[in-house]
């Protein structure tokens, strides 16, 4: 602070005073003013408070079953006191600390989760998420709020579009739902009757349709004639179905359009399916079921635990992020392999470039890092599945009301954890396949490198032998070019003999250079060095 105050005084007294005089040089003046303004605002940009503050996302359920979603700024020094967790546990799940692998810590009244992409603190009625501005955290927040609105906002509402299994409800409630369903169907039938009934009806057509209906009723269970429920009539065309109240008359005919082909005895007693409001459309269901794993247990069951819902969504989003990250690496790897194959098909120089080796090393390092994260997450899930005490301590909502000794069945939590364990196993299998692919590709590159190295060694040997034979011929011809007595100057056949010798020697040199492998085998056989 002492240095910055002196710099500010110096700039305000001297620099700004002389800069303002350069009115003619507008660009220079603006550049200097921008420089001095950045110096003045340096303390605001690099203040210590910005490095120590942490933004947190809080999702809380009140006693009135109201959902509160807020964001808070906390200091790192006050964060353990606000979250009521020790510094050692906070250090393991802090997103700013990249030295720790994914962890799942089970404490007495909370679950601490770090998946590599998400970090959160889960209690029986609230959730704290780190880095709420991250896209994955925003998506997790929206999914949790949507599920909570379905659970608390539309629980028991028949128009909410939620499927309720009847085996989890009491008989009275089941009967009420059946009666309500029949009442709605009956009202729809009477409304269609008022709109579509016509006075002029062909007698022959009416009798044929009535005979078909009598054949169908003989195969189904008898019901009250006053009650009209849509059935699954496979023998009729599904355009028009005619029904009679007491006797088949021309005036008491109902026109029933195609609504839903539902078997009365099977579908009504097994499942009540109600067309919901616009709030639960297909897009919301796809977002909630983000992976192929359907979390129907948490959406449809009566006793829903808030902590399991948050844990399920955070784990699903994190595993999906691992899958996307693995797909991007797989795409880049395929591109590199296809590029190398195209080069080989085009008969280019089959050499390994430095850039290709560096990229393969980067891909291998990324896979190794991803493998470490997935193995750490798998090991944490396996430890929890083996420890019964941790499994019981994860029932935070139940432990808020009863003691831990009364918890005997935790099969629902086992299903949740084993589901995510299976997903991590599948990702680990894909990662191992990619590592094997990279290892195979590296072996091919090594073979390619050895092949090219042998070609260069062979070329070097050919050049050496050709140089040797050519140098011998050059030495012989150079002897005749000197002004020395060789005692064959006066011989008429001297030039002819020397020319034949040099030509034959050149032919021998060309032959051995071309068939250098036989020469190398000869040297190896007699240990010629």
Curated annotation (Swiss-Prot):
Q: Which GO terms describe its biological process?
A: magnesium ion transport
Example GO CC term: the record gives: mitochondrial inner membrane
Transmembrane spans: 456-476, 493-513
**GO molecular function terms noted in the UniProt entry:** magnesium ion transmembrane transporter activity
**Keywords of the record:** Coiled coil, Ion transport, Magnesium, Membrane, Mitochondrion, Mitochondrion inner membrane, Transit peptide, Transmembrane, Transmembrane helix, Transport
**Membrane topology field:** Multi-pass membrane protein
Q: Which domain of life is it from?
A: Eukaryota
Q: Which Gene3D superfamilies match?
A: 2.40.128.330, Magnesium transport protein CorA, transmembrane region
What the entry lists under CDD domains is as follows: Mrs2_Mfm1p-like (cd12823)
Q: What is its main location?
A: mitochondrion
* Protein function: Mitochondrial inner membrane magnesium transporter required for mitochondrial magnesium homeostasis. Involved in the development of the sporozoite in the mosquito vector midgut.
Q: Which family does it belong to?
A: Belongs to the CorA metal ion transporter (MIT) (TC 1.A.35) family.
Q: What is this protein called?
A: Mitochondrial inner membrane magnesium transporter MIT1
Q: What is the lineage of its organism?
A: Eukaryota, Sar, Alveolata, Apicomplexa, Aconoidasida
